[in-house]
Amino acid sequence: MEDQKTTNQVNLIQLHSLKWVDDELAMIQDQYSATLSAINFPCYTQSSSKTKDYLVVVDGKVYGMVREINCGNRFEYRALMADGNYIEPVSDIFHASAIDAVCELARRHHDNEFANQLTDYVIAVSQVQELASAQLRKNTKYLLSEHF
């Protein structure tokens, strides 16, 4: 009976210690809400069964398109100019999120302030995800050490 009580307490501590993630992400969302609300994806076309092209409009100005490619267990995103030509990403790899591709389009349109705001948003979210992942690894290690 004592072992079960200890396990339940550990699980509560683990869940409680990750509550900060939701709070942090909500603060980031609030901080960047004006930037994010400027982006519209008013329509898309289905290019193939695994590809969708989304029109990107920022503050009423057409920036181009974002191509979403379904790779089975993940999606890749590419920025396209309005004429359909790809913009090669700076890193030479496809983007893991549509926001990164929109950032690429913003830079192409010399909207560096907007691109920098999007980059800051992506970095802030990534940092929270990394910290949460580290906390989960720590909790898992702790739970495993308690039982084995």
Language-model segment annotations:
Residues 2-58:
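Negatively charged, low-complexity tracts enriched in Asp/Glu with abundant Ser/Thr
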Residues 6-12, 71, 140-142:
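N-terminal cationic leader/targeting segments used for protein routing and processing
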Residues 6-9, 17, 95-98, 118, ...:
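Generic short amphipathic/hydrophobic targeting helices enriched at N-termini
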Residues 55, 62-88:
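Short aromatic-glycine-(Arg/Gly/Cys) micro-motifs in beta-strand/loop hairpins
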Residues 82-100:
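A short, exposed loop/beta-hairpin motif centered on an aromatic-Gly-Thr core
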Residues 94-118:
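A contiguous, mid-protein "functional segment" used to position or interact
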